Amino acid sequence: MESSEDQPGPQPQYPGNHCIRDGDFVVLKREDVFKAVQVQRRKKVTFEKQWFYLDNIIGHSYGTTFEVTNGGSLQPKKKKEEPTSETKEAGTDNRNIIDDGKSQKLTQDDIKALKDKGIKGEEIVQQLIENSTTFRDKTEFAQDKYIKKKKKKYEAMITVVKPSTRILSVMYYAREPGKINHMRYDTLAQMLTLGNIRAGNKMIVMETCAGLVLGAMMERMGGFGSIIQLYPGGGPVRAATACFGFPKSFLSGLYEFPLNKVDSLLNGTFSAEMLSSEPKDIASVEESNGTLEEKQTSEQENEDSIAEAPESNHPEEQERMEIVSQDPDYKEPKESGSKKDYIQEKQRRQEEQKKRHLEAAALLSERNADGLIVASRFHPTPLLLSLLDFVAPSRPFVVYCQYKEPLLECYTKLRERGGVINLRLSETWLRNYQVLPDRSHPKLLMSGGGGYLLSGFTVAMDNLKADPSLKSSTSTLESHKTEEPAAKKRKCPESDS
């Protein structure tokens, strides 16, 4: 048994403490709305129609709640004891309350004047309660609902949390589900479990979910093991992966390989010369997209319009715009100096990427991967049938698709091909519950679906096909139906005698 000292592992993401530092990736949370940003000094962030700077969150621990004050400054929110139900004056019935719009004495001009004076949202909510003629007549539950509604409107409270698979998957599913193929967060959790994602594995992943599945696998593996990502087009899309904020040590076990070179790798005709044109395309995509900071700035300006805009008719172009450079030291030519230095840096990156592609090809050629994860917008059948050859026997594979019919076809093809067992097509059912004192119940609105999963295990085929065995068993059953068993034939004459 090898000791842990022989294999030094990667350093933890936040050594020593859980404080927010300059350059970290964080997630801003307000009620049920999330947004992932990178912490930078004097960087203007727009979130939920409010703008502010992130300077004051540096040094605070994750989970701290801040209040947006005048001038875009964030101030830590002090926790105050809420009044208990015994001190509240509440009515017993809401039937006598008439909603005529005249119960509030404060007008919109009065509220605007309070905001202009710099009065905090908490004080505005308190004045709204005091100037409401029907507040004390409402039941205790109605009062809590009223206060919660007014706090959401007038109090600008933002909580800074650490990025995780669950938080980022909830964020993408709520704001831009098309970029992750409408994969719900519980479906992603099922994929990680069925795929047996753990530290030390050698995994293959083919996904077009903006890098969310890849980031979830990297988080669960903790920097131990290796992941080979197969990508279509000019380069891998890792916008969601960058939001995790993984350290550089996590990237040492991450490899990439173009999907259009898989057939040549299976046929044994793959060579290094075939990769000569690949890095040039990736560099041009990165050059056209700009850095991560420029991309996030443009996202902040168009934040509200993105959520309401229809999906693009060209998903490949839409995803290519999300490509993020893996090298944080890389700079655009306008920042790196002369054009000659930029060309040399570009050539160095191309050679380095070509080397990583060759390393990925060598890992795939061993055909001993510990698992396969497929979650793409393409038809799963040809992808799975070709990629299963790289997986070792007795290893799991999981395929995600937004629709059931492609997975049914894939299920049939796998049965005909053989070499797999325990095939299972599943769909998870998720329902959220409101859990509050004396009023816990399922929420009225719920998700209609989170996609479908096809899972199974690989086995050694021993050069045998599945079809003849299936047909022989079927023909045997048919012969038993048409002809009586021999034992029953012998018993019939004995009973007559």
Swiss-Prot record:
Disulfide bridge map: none
Binding site for substrate: R349, R377
Phosphoserine modification, residue list: S298, S305
Lineage: superkingdom: Eukaryota
Gene source species: Bos taurus (Bovine)
Protein family: Belongs to the TRM6/GCD10 family.
GO process terms (BP): mRNA processing; tRNA methylation
Compositionally biased spans, kind Basic and acidic residues: 79-102, 311-354, 478-497
Protein purpose: Substrate-binding subunit of tRNA (adenine-N(1)-)-methyltransferase, which catalyzes the formation of N(1)-methyladenine at position 58 (m1A58) in initiator methionyl-tRNA. Together with the TRMT61A catalytic subunit, part of a mRNA N(1)-methyltransferase complex that mediates methylation of adenosine residues at the N(1) position of a small subset of mRNAs: N(1) methylation takes place in tRNA T-loop-like structures of mRNAs and is only present at low stoichiometries.
Subcellular locations according to the entry: Nucleus
InterPro entries referenced in this protein's UniProt entry, alphabetically: TRM6 (IPR017423)
Keyword tRNA processing included in the entry's annotation: yes
Region annotation (Disordered) ranges: 69-102, 276-354, 468-497
Protein name: tRNA (adenine(58)-N(1))-methyltransferase non-catalytic subunit TRM6
Keywords: Nucleus, Phosphoprotein, tRNA processing
Cited PANTHER family: TRANSLATION INITIATION FACTOR EIF3-RELATED (PTHR12945), TRNA (ADENINE(58)-N(1))-METHYLTRANSFERASE NON-CATALYTIC SUBUNIT TRM6 (PTHR12945:SF0)
Stretch list, region Substrate: 94-104, 145-154, 175-182, 415-423, 434-441
Residues carrying Phosphothreonine: T107
Pfam families: Gcd10p
Any single Gene Ontology cellular-component annotation: nucleus
Record text on subunit structure and interactions: Heterotetramer; composed of two copies of TRMT6 and two copies of TRMT61A.
